[in-house]
């Protein structure tokens, strides 16, 4: 429905001065016209603060033709509208029959019984919360005042600045349209402004005369348009460093669903962050395009909600879409220091937190993958209203433990598992970044399992994803692991050697991976581990393995005040390798734990499958030249049996060693399988010698009697 309101001001002249007596209102709704006359005094009572003088100035009906023509000539006109036939997706799914309808403004305990209960949220109250703020959508400043009437309304916005306030971007949005405005102040103090407007053509704001949208529209398809508003001078200035592919920008904004579009933008930002684009952002096409796309991601969610009118929005869709926006909000805050106002519903957050309170977090890993992801998304969305943080970590850890137990050893994560763990990781990330986690075992277990999943093949898969720009580079357990040994040379040796991969792209992928593992990141800190206080030289730590009752700190020097000290002294490592168990989180009283102990060898490693005698232990492998390879945490008999029945131990490579780390702080090297093989080979050789000797003796006896 399009509503056109035309105010006719009737001026009565009294003593040479103009005064407003009444307002004549003409309403034209889809061809049906109505006329009303409202006394000004009555209108002022209903709308206090409404100034007739301001209305008169804004209408500018006395503007002469020359001024109007000059204003028209200043504004940039497109060379032509790019018409594209695009398929517009059905974003919000139909609400299932029997769904509980929830009013976002009236969420109370017990409104939904649990995760299995279908539910939806009424669109109108939800939209009102998303666009709660009142602000100036269309400012009374040039060039906007040349083209639009000033507009204040309920809105949301994304705002950021680069180089102080020299460059600013604001993506202001209603549920109808988005206006992304770039503003740059030059060294001379000149200000250049350019705006991109996206939305349904029929819902775009009214224009001043003599403008029309066809001359301003860059791209159009079906219901949607992309409009440029700037002056010719400002356009020429921006064109020096901002030449966006408007066709691609517009096509993605129209054809992608809200959640998939937000994920696309998130992936761009992750890659940008890894390349250092956050620390030193370039004012180029890629950066400026990404800024606009960030605001489009937020707009598409609010727009989809608004398009349902007086309907109801499926809660699963809301959980998925607002999870993506939450993650996106986190990274633009970290990357650009961006501010997001609005696009947040306290009703949705409260409902999500209440639903999570009905779930036994420690049993979350036993649910289906679909329910795990739904619950973890709700946990992220409802985090501000959750209250109890440790329970959420327990849920993410339960899901990770379940995935770890059924994951093949040393294999990269498959797509579905990577997505599930990516969703769960943001519960952990939020607590680490907000510095609210206490010394809980759940977080230690989460990081231990992440460390165990960070194998050479997993690293290779992530590097491939980063080099090709695919989603496999978006998340890896390595990002939340306690591995600190991954250098550039080591990562290059793990990178896939494929003809399709450009070596420059691989090199950039390695740099990005290293950037993601930077110790300056909050999520790479191990401050929450009690044994952390026993470490004096953090730059010498290679890996931390927190087991039950003992934490092993592997380092390249002896400066760890642990309960004991082991050294891999029989190797040819270019740098030393020390293992310091910290038992019951108690540091040694002295500077170090004394002289290194000899690591004993197990010559007969038993292949038992009847009981889990190694549960709670960890296996650590290292190469005499390359250093640490990987660690495996034995969580169950299935994991133990998988280790014993597979080719886990590569004893053909005599330069690789396997250490067993126990829960009492003891370290042992496993060499039994190699010794078994040697005994078998020796037995075969002795049998062959005996057989040959027997044949020789028989030959001599036969020859003697002949």
UniProtKB/Swiss-Prot annotation:
Q: Which domain of life is it from?
A: Viruses
Annotated glycan sites: 60, 435, 549, 604, 664
The reply to whether Glycoprotein figures as a keyword in the UniProt entry is yes
Which stretches are transmembrane?
A: 683-703
Any one cellular-component term (Gene Ontology): viral envelope
One Pfam annotation reads Herpes_glycoH_C
Q: Which residues lie on this side of the membrane: Virion surface?
A: 19-682
Q: Does the keyword Iron apply?
A: no
Q: Which residues lie on this side of the membrane: Intravirion?
A: 704-706
Disulfide pairs here are: 278-335, 454-478, 534-587, 612-615
Q: Outline the segment boundaries, as ranges, of region: Interaction with gL.
A: 165-229
Localization of this protein? Virion membrane; Host cell membrane; Host endosome membrane
- What's the PTM story here? N-glycosylated, O-glycosylated, and sialylated.
Please state the span of the N-terminal signal peptide per the UniProt entry: 1-18
UniProt xrefs under Gene3D superfamilies: Herpesvirus glycoprotein H, C-terminal domain (2.60.40.3190), Herpesvirus glycoprotein H, domain D-II (3.90.380.20)
Location (main, coarse): virion
Subunit and partners: Interacts with glycoprotein L (gL); this interaction is necessary for the correct processing and cell surface expression of gH. The heterodimer gH/gL seems to interact with gB trimers during fusion. The heterodimer gH/gL interacts with host EPHA2 to facilitate virus internalization and fusion. Interacts with glycoprotein 42/BZLF2.
As for what it does, the entry says:
The heterodimer glycoprotein H-glycoprotein L is required for the fusion of viral and plasma membranes leading to virus entry into the host cell. Following initial binding to host receptor, membrane fusion is mediated by the fusion machinery composed of gB and the heterodimer gH/gL. May also be involved in the fusion between the virion envelope and the outer nuclear membrane during virion morphogenesis. The heterodimer gH/gL targets also host EPHA2 to promote viral entry.
Q: Which family does it belong to?
A: Belongs to the herpesviridae glycoprotein H family.
Q: What HAMAP family does the record point to? A: HSV_GH
Stated name of the protein: Envelope glycoprotein H
